[in-house]
UniProtKB/Swiss-Prot annotation:
Swiss-Prot/TrEMBL catalytic activity: (6R)-5,10-methylene-5,6,7,8-tetrahydrofolate + glycine + H2O = (6S)-5,6,7,8-tetrahydrofolate + L-serine
Assembly notes: Homodimer.
Transmembrane segments: none
Protein name: Serine hydroxymethyltransferase
Function: Catalyzes the reversible interconversion of serine and glycine with tetrahydrofolate (THF) serving as the one-carbon carrier. This reaction serves as the major source of one-carbon groups required for the biosynthesis of purines, thymidylate, methionine, and other important biomolecules. Also exhibits THF-independent aldolase activity toward beta-hydroxyamino acids, producing glycine and aldehydes, via a retro-aldol mechanism.
S-S bridge residues: none
Gene Ontology molecular function terms on file: glycine hydroxymethyltransferase activity; pyridoxal phosphate binding
């Protein structure tokens, strides 16, 4: 990165950025929600677009001088529509959580009932967790995974839905390695008169590449982040397969009287001015670049390799005696239950960090440990695949992780971690991140 000016003006911050660049280039990133953007994405995010206020939407701004940021936002919207095959998209949400908030605010009233996957079973904070707005403003009910299979039991989902009759059902996860039967979720939603929202923040890139099922034909709303498997800048997005009249009865005045607002109009108003003001135009520019990259044939090859790497790694972990929640993976991640190894997620995360491997501790279903300790770790392949690593590398990485975890109680574990760190550094230097230099 060209940071000469920053180095001269703010040496303290420059040093932090240089060290972080070194960490990213010389250690292995296996956090499932992280990835490396292209230099083009970073250039767009660091461009003069950051200087422009642009409240409103293209052609309907509250500020003047928006003709060029309008181009950027329209590019992002048009490319997202082509990428996912949707009629409506809003690229302004600052995050996936903001996107989820906008959807919930647009169709729910405080106290309404919602259903989502339990956080401790792989869900997300915004799907009804009691520590989040989604569990504080609304009456949240959680479905979970089966204790034996580790998979979602759709019969139990239907049973819960019929019992509580939610107004919104959310399908999506942050630590679930299987797919969602979105068609079955829609049947259940229709039975109880609920909206259906899919949160595809994690597998969005794999869906865009056509390798996992697209939920848009079956859901009222689809939300996502724009980073993770999409390899864009950190941000959020809301989509609808097709627009429809809002069923809440919200109207708008016309010259001849009034009409029902289309759901797109309700959603746009909920994003801005509902929960946000000025959009981050430099990030939206970066989203446009990333969506353009994802439309190229090479992105499908990348996404396919992400899945292959995860499958190879999961197979090796199973061979080494690890329990993978749900029995395997069909996407980019896996959740390792470490209870049989007598190691906590916290200990594993810290040891692997010292060995140059970054993962995150993660609760497993029916965990008896706190979220600050946990019984598992979450492992993902998006970032390592961006570096060009393949199945053979995935097997090696699983072996190195096993070497660290099985040595947790040994007196020479620190020496072993230093040795593994050197192997990891060599692996990373053989597979550099394109364009990243300290």
């Amino acid at each position: 990165m060209d940071t000469d000016i920053l180095q001269k003006q703010d040496s303290e911050l420059f040093e932090a950025i240089a060290k972080e660049t070194g960490r990213q280039t010389e250690t292995l990133e296996l956090i499932a929600s992280e990835n490396f953007t292209s230099r083009a994405v970073m250039q767009a995010c660091g461009s003069v677009m950051t200087n422009k206020y642009a409240e409103g939407y293209p052609g309907k701004r509250y500020y003047g001088g928006c003709e060029f940021v309008d181009i950027a936002e329209n590019l992002a919207r048009d490319r997202a529509k082509k990428l996912f095959g949707c009629d409506y998209v809003n690229v302004q949400p600052h995050s996936g959580s903001s996107a989820n908030m906008a959807v919930l605010f647009s169709v729910l009233k405080p106290g309404d009932r919602i259903m989502g996957l339990d956080l401790s079973h792989g869900g997300h904070l915004t799907h009804g967790s009691s520590v989040n707005f989604s569990g504080q403003m609304y009456e949240a009910h959680s479905y979970g995974v089966d204790r034996e299979t580790g998979c979602i039991d759709m019969n139990k989902v239907e049973e819960l839905a019929l019992q509580v009759r939610p107004k919104l059902i959310i399908c999506g996860a942050s630590a679930y390695s299987q797919g969602f039967d979105v068609k079955a979720f829609r049947v259940i939603a229709d039975k109880v008169g609920a909206f259906l929202m899919a949160d595809i923040a994690h597998p969005a890139g794999l869906i865009a590449a056509g390798l996992l099922g697209n939920p848009l034909p079956h859901c009222h709303f689809v939300t996502t982040t724009t980073h993770k498997t999409l390899r864009g800048p950190r941000g959020g997005m809301i989509m609808m397969g097709s627009d429809f009249e809002n069923p809440m009865g919200i109207t708008i005045k016309t010259k001849t009287g009034s009409r029902l607002k289309m759901m797109s109009e309700v959603m746009d108003a909920e994003v801005m001015p509902g929960i946000q003001g000025g959009p981050l135009m430099h990030i939206i520019a970066g989203k446009a670049v990333a969506f353009g990259e994802a439309l190229q044939p090479a992105f499908r090859d990348y996404a396919a390799q992400v899945i292959k790497n995860a499958a190879a790694m999961a197979e090796k972990f199973t061979e080494l005696g690890y329990k993978i929640v749900s029995g395997g993976t069909k996407n980019h991640l896996m959740l390792l239950d470490l209870r049989s190894k007598n190691v906590t997620g916290k200990v594993a995360e810290n040891l692997l960090h010292s060995a140059g491997i970054t993962v995150n501790k993660n609760m497993v279903p029916f965990d008896d440990k706190s979220p600050f300790v946990t019984s598992g770790i979450r492992v993902g392949t998006p970032a390592m695949t961006t570096r060009g690593m393949n199945e053979a590398d995935s097997v090696l990485i699983a072996e190195l992780i096993d070497r660290v975890i099985t040595s947790a109680e040994k007196p020479d574990v620190a020496d072993l971690c230093r040795s593994v760190r050197e192997e990891i550094k060599a692996l990373c230097l053989r597979n550099p991140i394109d364009g990243y230099t300290v």
